[in-house]
């Protein structure tokens, strides 16, 4: 299955949640697209679980097969499966770049990582799904610092709050990972228990 590259607002409307963050088109029409978008539909338990799983997938830009692997890894962890799943998703490098305010959207963050603009602990990483660990240090590469996306990020620093589990330092926009996030530090509008129930069937 190919990665979805179509209009994200349409997916946001279908799943009734802002998958981008600050999507003005979604705010104007927060109901499903199509002729019968405003109609009230009785939602089954399965549909609610499926929608929650899809919300998580599209929020973090993860394909179904990879998302399933994340879930299976979360099951093996000692904590609550749903919380472990969110922690895995939050620790992706593209998400960390987004959370740090160096990209306006996760999709943009993914592109910046893919283009090789970052190092992790001094090693260049161009894999968006790379998982960061506690005490990792993420730097913008020297030759990338003056490119337009990072100039904009410096000018707009502070517009979006940076979560307390990471820190952005100075003009070099270094990201320090103090810890991996707890559930209370993850502000995505997801009910992770519904995802667990979906895969538990």
Curated annotation (Swiss-Prot):
Coiled coil spans: none
Alphabetical GO biological process terms: ribosomal small subunit biogenesis; translation
Superkingdom of origin: Bacteria
SUPFAM superfamilies: Alpha-L RNA-binding motif
UniProt keyword Coiled coil, yes or no: no
GO cellular component: small ribosomal subunit
Keyword terms: Ribonucleoprotein, Ribosomal protein, RNA-binding, rRNA-binding
InterPro entries xrefs: Ribosomal_uS4, Ribosomal_uS4_bac-type, Ribosomal_uS4_CS, Ribosomal_uS4_N, S4_RNA-bd, S4_RNA-bd_sf
GO molecular-function terms, A-Z: rRNA binding; structural constituent of ribosome
Domain S4 RNA-binding stretches: 91-157
Function: One of the primary rRNA binding proteins, it binds directly to 16S rRNA where it nucleates assembly of the body of the 30S subunit. With S5 and S12 plays an important role in translational accuracy.
Protein family according to the UniProt entry: Belongs to the universal ribosomal protein uS4 family.
Subunit structure of this chain's protein: Part of the 30S ribosomal subunit. Contacts protein S5. The interaction surface between S4 and S5 is involved in control of translational fidelity.
Protein name listed in UniProt: Small ribosomal subunit protein uS4
Naturally occurring in which organism (per UniProt): Mycolicibacterium paratuberculosis (strain ATCC BAA-968 / K-10)
């Amino acid at each position: 299955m190919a990665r979805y590259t179509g209009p994200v607002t349409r997916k946001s409307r279908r799943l009734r949640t802002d998958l981008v963050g600050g999507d003005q088109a979604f705010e104007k029409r927060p109901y499903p697209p199509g002729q019968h978008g405003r109609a009230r539909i009785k939602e089954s338990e399965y549909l609610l679980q499926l929608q929650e799983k899809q919300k998580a997938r599209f929020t973090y830009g993860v394909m179904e097969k990879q998302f399933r692997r994340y879930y299976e890894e979360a099951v093996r962890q000692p904590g609550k499966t749903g919380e472990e799943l969110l922690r895995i998703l939050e620790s992706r490098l593209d998400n960390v770049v987004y959370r740090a305010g160096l990209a306006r959207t996760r999709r943009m963050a993914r592109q910046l990582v893919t283009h090789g603009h970052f190092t992790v602990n001094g090693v260049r990483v161009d894999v968006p799904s790379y998982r960061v660990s506690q005490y990792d240090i993420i730097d913008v590469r020297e030759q990338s610092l003056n490119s337009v996306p990072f100039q904009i990020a410096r000018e707009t620093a502070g517009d979006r709050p940076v979560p307390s589990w990471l820190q952005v330092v100075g003009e070099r926009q270094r990201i320090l990972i103090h810890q991996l996030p707890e559930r209370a530090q993850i502000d995505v509008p997801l009910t992770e228990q519904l995802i667990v129930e979906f895969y538990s069937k």
